[in-house]
Each structure stands twice: as C-alpha cells, then as structure tokens.
A protein has these predicted regions:
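Juxta-kinase regulatory segment immediately upstream of eukaryotic protein kinase catalytic domains
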Residues: 2-33
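Active-site activation/catalytic loop segments of kinase-like enzymes and analogous catalytic loops
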Residues: 248-293, 307-325
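Activation of the activation-loop gatekeeper triad in protein kinase-fold domains
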Residues: 236-241
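Helical subdomain adjoining the active site within ATP-dependent kinase catalytic cores
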Residues: 288, 292-299, 310-355
C-alpha cells in the first residue's frame, strides 16, 4: 500500500517560509547535514501549518501557527512541544519532537521540529485505488476507538503532565469558553448558536472521570501503517490536548463520524471513511467505548451537542481570518455553510437526544 502514503506538496501562496533565515538556523542545529534545503507543505490542515523539510539526508517536519492568526491560545507551539516531549515515551503514536524555536526573528512565529511519521492518512475520500473489505473496515473502527481508549487510560500524572490542565470545572469552562469564542468571531446570524449555548448551560453533566484528552480525534489526524491500515502508528495535531473529561474526546470523535444513514447534507461533514461497509455506527462506537472502559455514557448526547458546537466555532474562527483578509486561502470561502450545518446538527442532537 506504499502508493497511498501521505505526501507533502507545493507550498500554498502566502504560506511560504523565509528560507534565508530558516536555512542557517537548521544548519546551526544540524551541522553534519550537507546539501540544499528543500521545503514542501502538507496540504490538508486548516489550523497549524505543517511542512516537510529535507536538509541533505535528514528529513524533519516543521509545525508553526497559521499566518494572520487571531487566536494565540489555540496555537501555542511551546505548549504543544512540551506535551509531545513527555508524551511520546509513554504513548508511541504521539510524534517525537526534536527542537523548539521561540525566536520570532527566524520565521515570524514560534515553531518546532519533529520526526516524520510515514504512513497512510484516510480522509473523506479514499485515495484512488484503495479499497478494503467490510471486515477490514470493522477492524479499523475497532482500532480507532481502542487507540482513543489507550490514550484515556494513560497515566498522565506519571508522564509529568499533571499541570497541563485544570480538571475541576473543565466542562463548564469549555462550554463558556467556546460560546465566547463563537461570538468573538461571529460574521453571520445563526439563531441556533444562542439556543445551543443556553441549552448547554442548563444541562451540564457531572464529570465522572478525568484523563488526558486529545480534543481533535478523527481519522485524518491518524497515520496508519502502510502494510496494515488497521494499525495506527501516529496521532497528529495535539494543539488542543489537555486534562479533562474523556467523554468530551468521545463526543468530538462522534461529531466527525458520519453514518451511512445520515441525511445527505450531513455527508458533507464527513472527515474519514466512516460510511464504508462494515464501519461502526456512532451508536456502536459509544457501546464499544462503554463496554471497554466501564464509563457511564448515558449523557453522550450532551457531549455530541457540545462537540458539534465546538467544531462550528473552530470553523467559524478559521473563516473569520479569511473574512478579515488575514489569509487568502480560497478553501475558506465556503466555510459559513459548514458552520450552519454543524450548528443545525448540534441543536437537533440537543432536542432529540439522538446520536
């Protein structure tokens, strides 16, 4: 399956790196590498930007905040680097980081370097020519949720990550914070937004347990083994990880997971091959998680409501940068439609309690 490996591409206009400063910086820290510096960009991300750097025989990956970012807390490179520097040893899918640079003089923003993880990333459309039977899709669904459970069971205190977040009052702060972020980045009037915010405040569940949570767990953040796509070898995009209620992580995974029986408009929100024959449904994911962990998932509809609202806010924040002229990436122009879809889906879940 090596033909389906994820590869970097040409750098998007407006997201070029200043090689006159990056090149000498790299040679200072990797003095034994000869040859010219080659830079390409991984094209899929909408948040932090990811580049492939080839310096002689050495390949590294560079992560930096988006250009024109308004939301600094969502792009804290030093925090992400610190988490990964402790996490990789106890949770192998986390990338191995190499170097952090907090000097804005180099690239205009902090960044860090990490080892590349080669493999297959599955997105809303399978790579042309990649097919797998229903039993593989089912095993992949199991691996998807088992890997999340593995993360939630990880002893974050032993890993030195106790100070990463404040679990007390986590869910209440999240609801309040994401509500504030939505209205700070608001560009259109969607009546569902205020209704959802009020409903969540009135229906906050009591948090039963605490764990390290990724906060953006979905297929296109997973790297799969090129020889066995049911084996997860990497988990990317840790900028929102924290200590909190693990059911918020499960809710996020469900928000990205579109069932084959969902309405046609919901199919536009699919972030992975979740409608492949043999794949779990959202209900099966919840059942599997509850069976393996013993967690009470009776209020999972709240967590899905919140997760869909949170995704709407994230998309709205990205669109806000485009709306304000802070980025020219044309992919962002149609994002209000996605915001509206997510808000409608969130409100429907709140009203029906159906996942």
């Amino acid at each position: 399956m090596s033909d389906f490996l994820d590869h970097p591409a040409r750098i998007r206009q407006g997201e070029e790196l200043d090689l006159t400063k990056l090149d000498p910086y790299l040679r200072e820290h990797f003095p034994n590498e000869a040859g010219s510096l080659q830079v390409r960009q991984y094209p899929s991300g909408h948040s932090n930007l990811t580049y492939s750097l080839q310096l002689g025989a050495r390949e590294v990956v560079l992560r930096r905040p988006p250009f024109g970012s308004k939301v600094k807390s969502a792009h804290d490179m030093s925090r992400e680097y610190r988490v990964l520097s402790k996490l990789h040893a106890v949770y192998s899918p986390a990338p191995e980081v190499l170097l952090y640079c907090g000097d804005d003089e180099v690239l205009g923003a902090p960044f860090y370097l990490m080892q590349p993880i080669h493999g297959i990333i599955l997105r809303h459309r399978l790579p042309p020519g990649l097919e797998f039977p229903a039993e593989t899709a089912r095993r992949l669904s199991e691996s998807f949720i088992e890997n999340l459970i593995r993360l939630h069971r990880m002893d974050y205190q032993a890993a030195g990550l106790s100070d990463l977040g404040k679990p007390e009052g986590y869910l209440e702060r999240q609801v309040r914070g994401w509500t504030d972020r939505y209205f700070a980045a608001k560009t259109h009037d969607y009546p569902e937004a205020q209704k959802i915010a009020a409903w969540m405040q009135e229906h906050l569940p009591v948090t039963a347990c605490t764990s390290l949570i990724h906060n953006d767990y979905k297929y296109d953040n997973l790297i799969l083994d090129s020889q066995d796509i049911t084996k997860i070898v990497g988990l990317l995009d840790w900028e929102m990880c924290t200590i909190g209620d693990p059911l918020t992580d499960l809710g996020t995974a469900l928000a990205y997971w579109i069932d084959a029986t969902d309405p046609e408009e919901m199919q536009h929100l699919r972030w992975g091959p979740t409608t492949q024959p043999g794949s779990f449904t959202r209900a099966e994911i919840v059942q599997y998680y509850a069976r393996q962990t013993g967690c009470d998932t009776s209020q999972i509809a709240f967590y899905l409501t919140f997760a869909r609202f949170k995704l709407a806010v994230i998309v709205q924040q990205i669109y806000y940068r485009y709306h304000q002229g802070l980025t020219t990436d044309k992919r962002f122009a149609s994002m209000p439609e996605r915001v509206q879809l997510l808000l409608r889906a969130s409100w429907e879940c709140a009203q029906t309690q159906h996942i």
